[in-house]
Curated annotation (Swiss-Prot):
TM region(s), chain numbering: none
Protein name from the UniProt record: Replication protein E1
Stored PROSITE patterns: SF3_HELICASE_1 (PS51206)
Span(s) of short sequence motif Nuclear export signal: 86-95
Residues in SF3 helicase domain copies: 382-546
Motif Nuclear localization signal: where in chain: 72-74
The protein's Enzyme Commission number: 5.6.2.4
Modified residues (Phosphoserine): S87
DNA-binding region: region residues: 134-297
The keyword Repeat is annotated on this UniProt entry: no
Lineage: Viruses, Monodnaviria, Shotokuvirae, Cossaviricota, Papovaviricetes
Gene coding for it: E1
Length: 593
């Protein structure tokens, strides 16, 4: 019989035996739901979320931690360098395309995060070493100064530690930064060595003497400049040369009379422990060198003192004595004056000589030259209008006033006395005192009529003033001074001298008496030029006069009406100056400022 086509029949039992294919059947057991859940979660990635460490034996836990700690100590993690540190441009190179950043409110929970991963970033040790190297000694000194609460006290303390002496023992204090002197003691803290060495050369063009004492990053300078300088100028110069801040520098003048201060600087020079340029200052030589002390014992010269007082226009004994004593620090003759036991006599003789010189100088000048000398400041302004407006306010004809003033300055007979009369508080005294003060005139008072010398100040004046003349004063003038107002020579009684033949200078008189209507003064009236001031002087809310007349007002007035007053001056020389400056001693022997 032929074979059947197709698949051979397979016995049912063979199929069950699995000889041709495998059949897996589910094995069902009587397991509880809890057991099934535990078995299903054995291989889960979120296992051990619940902390069941309490069930572990405590001894095993401590041993495990100890092993981990020892393992960590042996592990050397290679620190990762940031890409930006390797190359500034390498961080811009990417292989993978950039993806848009995801917005996240919070960081990941860290479930799949490896806590053992090291995020250590290597710190460049070379950069730290470089920053530490920049902190040199000069910068450390500067930082310690700038960080202190009291900078000056810190600098003074550092100075004493460096140089072994207090800065205040070497210097005297100038309260003002504008006070000038050629001698200065300068100290700077926290200065670089190269700048300090360069300063030695740069300062030589500014000074006559330079002494530089160096200690570490600090420097002490004793300087005598070629010209006088104030503290502001010195600080600007030193800050630019040393590239320093003003807080690092102290600048004061030396104690010119302190032997200890002079010996400190002199000792540094002779021991060759400092840099020196130029000749030794005179104040150091005077206090340290014996030969110089013997040579400085000069005899006092009165002529030099007189010349000094004349040049500075000192005519009072008190001003001469005080100012010449202050001048002793700079002038040997003034120092000899202080060392003398006859200072009072020298002062009196000096003032007497200066007054005689000044008196003769004034007498040798014409009125035009004297007015021009008083107008030293040739200012062109509009202040002269104050005088014109005040005269107009008082109802005075300005043209008549100019004519009277012209005759007044020329000392025309019977026209050399101007009288200003009127009620009180009209500005008569203010107007006249300003004019007399400007022309450096003298004031006499009838209160001294009991003295026969009450007219003596008029011999030393180009113009005189008699303020507030009463009726009794007019009777005296009418009785004794008619010929003096005529411009004639009269006899004047001078204290400790014989009677002097002199002429009365142009006089200005203020009074409340109307001399133009008083018949008792009929013979004196023709010798007077009178102006009436009837209006009360206007005042401001602060009780100040609205008309402000000053020396500048009179200067502008005379410059404005110079030709109208027929005043003349020599065009060949400066106005108000003599042909040759007065000299009562050899100029080369006087030390000038």
């Amino acid at each position: 019989m032929a074979d059947h086509k197709g698949t051979d029949n397979i016995d049912h039992n063979d199929v069950l035996d699995g000889s041709w294919c495998l059949i897996t059947e589910a094995e069902c057991e009587d397991d509880t739901l809890v057991d099934l859940f535990e078995e299903s979660t054995n291989d889960s990635v979120v296992s051990n979320l619940l902390d069941d460490s309490e069930s572990i034996i405590q001894g095993n836990s401590e041993e495990s931690d100890r092993c981990i700690q020892e393992l960590k100590r042996k592990l050397n993690v290679t620190p990762e360098k940031q890409i930006s540190e390797l190359s500034p441009r390498l961080s811009a190179v990417h292989i993978t395309p950039e993806r848009a950043s995801k917005r996240r409110l919070f960081n990941d929970s860290g479930v799949v995060e490896d806590e053992a991963e090291s995020n250590t970033i290597q710190v460049d040790s070379l950069l730290v070493q470089k920053d530490a190297g920049n902190q040199n000694g000069a910068e450390c000194e500067l930082n310690s100064i700038l960080r202190s609460n009291n900078i000056r006290a810190t600098v003074l303390c550092k100075f004493k530690d460096k140089f072994g002496v207090s800065f205040n023992e070497l210097t005297r204090s100038f309260k003002s930064d504008k006070t000038c002197t050629p001698n200065w003691v300068i100290t700077a803290i926290g200065i670089r060595e190269d700048l300090r060495d360069a300063c030695k050369v740069l300062l030589q063009q500014h000074v006559e003497f330079l002494e530089m004492i160096c200690n570490d990053f600090s420097v002490l300078l004793l300087v005598e400049f070629k010209v006088t300088k104030n503290r502001e100028t010195v600080l600007k110069l030193m800050c630019s040369m040393l590239n320093a801040k003003e807080e690092q520098i102290l600048c004061e003048p030396p104690k010119l009379k302190s032997t200890a201060a002079a010996l400190y600087f002199y000792k540094k020079i002779i021991t060759d422990t400092c840099f020196k340029y130029g000749t030794l200052p005179s104040w150091v030589s005077r206090l340290t060198i014996v030969e110089h002390q013997l040579a400085s014992a000069d005899t006092f010269s009165l002529s030099e003192m007189v010349q000094w007082a004349y040049d500075n226009d000192f005519t009072e004994e008190a001003s001469v004595a005080y100012n010449y004593a202050c001048y002793a620090t700079e002038n040997t003759n003034a120092a000899a004056f202080l060392a003398s036991n006859m200072q009072v006599k020298y002062v009196k003789d000096c003032v007497a000589m200066v007054r005689m010189y000044k008196r003769q100088e004034m007498k040798s000048m014409t009125m035009s030259e004297w007015i021009s000398k008083c107008c030293k400041e040739e200012t062109i302004g509009e202040e002269w209008k104050e005088i014109v407006q005040f005269l107009k306010y008082q109802g005075v004809n300005f043209l008549e006033f100019l004519i009277a003033l012209k005759q007044f300055f020329k000392c025309t007979p019977k026209k050399m006395c101007i009288v200003i009369y009127g009620p009180p508080d009209t500005g008569k005294s203010m107007f006249c005192f300003k004019l007399v003060q400007f022309l450096k005139g003298q004031v006499v008072s009838y209160i001294n009529k009991s003295s026969q010398f009450w007219l003596m100040p008029l011999q030393d004046a180009k113009i005189g003033l008699l303020d507030d003349a009463t009726h009794n004063c007019w009777i005296y003038l009418d009785t004794y001074l008619r010929n003096a107002f005529d411009g004639n020579t009269f006899c004047l009684d001078i204290k400790h001298k014989n009677l002097q033949q002199t002429k009365l200078p142009p006089m200005i008189i203020t009074t409340n008496v109307n001399v133009t209507t008083d018949e008792s003064l009929f013979y004196l009236r023709s010798r007077l030029t009178c102006f009436n001031f009837p209006n009360k002087l206007p005042m401001s809310d602060k009780d100040e006069p609205l008309f402000t007349i000053s020396d500048k007002s009179w200067t502008c007035f005379f410059r404005k009406f110079w030709n109208q007053l027929e005043l003349q001056e020599d065009a060949a020389r400066d106005p108000g100056e003599p042909e040759h400056p007065f000299c009562c001693t050899a100029r080369n022997s006087v030390d000038f400022d």
